[in-house]
Design a protein with these regions (language model features):
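Catalytic cofactor-binding cores of redox enzymes
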Residues: 123-161
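Short helix/loop capping segments that flank catalytic or ligand/cofactor-binding pockets
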Residues: 25-27, 85-87, 152-155, 162-166, ...
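A contiguous strand-loop segment
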Residues: 1-95, 128, 326
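Short, surface-exposed beta-strand-loop junctions and turns on beta-sheet-rich folds
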Residues: 22-24, 82-84, 159-161, 292-296
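Compact, glycine/acidic-enriched structural inserts
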Residues: 30-48, 85-125, 307-320
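C-terminus-biased signal that marks the final domain/tail of proteins
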Residues: 1-15, 129-131, 137-138, 147, ...
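A short, structured loop/turn motif at beta-sheet edges
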Residues: 71-72, 108-116, 239-247, 282
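Hydrophobic residues embedded in beta-strands of well-ordered beta-sheets
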Residues: 14, 75, 149-152, 160-161, ...
Length: 326
């Protein structure tokens, strides 16, 4: 059901990383949307988007994005929030009314920073609109970061959006962020350092090696376990002057919470990580790694993409690449 985190480096690169976990095959296509693109919202007149962006276009209706980064460095991903997300049953006068999945397009198309978001989101109303392809009203919440390094979570309550400063810089699924943060108290003993040997009576009990400090780190795929595991790994990531190392470390954390096919089954269908993604707010770069490939693909949000007349759909190789050495 998706894991996300942000990570900031000494060179002022601000990353937002996520897994896209789902049962329904999205067959997502990386798509660049130019600035001033005319977008038809479901519940409002068509509008020109102020900013261009790149994200993965999910095949669950007309232009639905699960994540993206815009030309100002604002990056966002959505995550299921089952049992917690609540939407409005009626339009609100004077508000921008939209379907749950359209919030990402609104954020990327109209906001330039977290501060800008906090101001504009006060007049957004999320409606209880069903996605006809999925046959549900998607229960969503969001993690967002910007070029200044701020990270927030956004939760819908009766259609209105609550913006929360996310100091842990991790988001999974239900329950609410505050519950996850409080739950971290149960894991305060975790450490990258090995535990010390202890004398019990006359018996010297030796530590179980250099990994002993991680004994008790949750290993399952529930929302609560993934939150703890991601928080621990993200918090202890080393800083490198080589930005390619920082980028790869983000993908390594995603590996630790990615769900392989067969590990989780929902109603007879496999629920797995369909792709991993890291977005760089400083360079406006979008790095994606689909499940069936070992390659990372980069899309640079440049002026060529931003000044086109229409969307650009970008093909990604989904095959395994092996380099033979003899």
């Amino acid at each position: 059901m998706c894991t996300g985190f942000s990570f900031f480096t000494q060179q002022q690169h601000h990353y937002l990383a996520r897994t896209m976990d789902f049962t329904f095959e999205f067959n997502g296509v990386p798509t660049a949307v130019p600035r001033n693109f005319e977008y038809q919202f479901d519940l409002e007149p068509s509008m020109k988007l102020t900013y261009g962006f790149v994200g993965t276009n999910l095949k669950v209706g007309r232009y639905r994005f699960g994540d993206g980064i815009n030309e100002c460095g604002v990056a966002i991903s959505n995550h299921y929030f089952t049992g917690e997300a609540s939407y409005s049953k009626h339009k609100r006068y004077g508000y921008f009314n939209m379907a749950p999945e359209e919030f990402i397009i609104w954020v990327l198309g109209f906001t330039k920073s977290i501060q800008d978001l906090k101001h504009k989101v006060k007049k957004v109303n999320i409606m209880n609109e069903k996605n006809e392809t999925l046959n549900i009203v998607p229960p969503l919440h969001f993690i967002i970061t910007d070029r200044e390094g701020h990270t927030v979570s956004v939760e819908p309550h009766n259609g209105l959006l609550i913006v929360k400063d996310n100091h842990v810089k991790v988001l999974t699924n239900a329950p609410k962020l505050e519950w996850h943060v409080e739950n971290l108290r149960n894991y305060a003993f975790l450490s990258p350092e090995k535990s010390t040997n202890q004398l019990v009576g006359k018996v010297l009990v030796r530590s179980m090696g250099c990994e002993a400090g991680t004994n008790g780190l949750p290993g399952g795929y529930t929302s609560t376990e993934r939150f703890v595991r991601t928080t621990y790994l993200r918090h202890h990531l080393p800083q490198s002057h080589d930005e390619s190392v920082n980028l790869m470390n983000c993908f390594k954390v995603l590996d630790a919470v990615s769900i392989p096919q067969g590990a989780v089954v929902d109603a007879g269908e496999t629920h797995y990580t369909q792709y991993q993604l890291v977005m760089d707010s400083k360079d406006r770069a979008y790095y994606i790694k689909p499940y069936f490939t070992n390659q990372i693909f980069k899309i640079q949000l440049n002026e060529q993409l931003l000044t086109k007349k229409d969307m650009t759909f970008i093909d990604v190789n989904h095959q395994l690449t092996i380099t033979q050495l003899n």
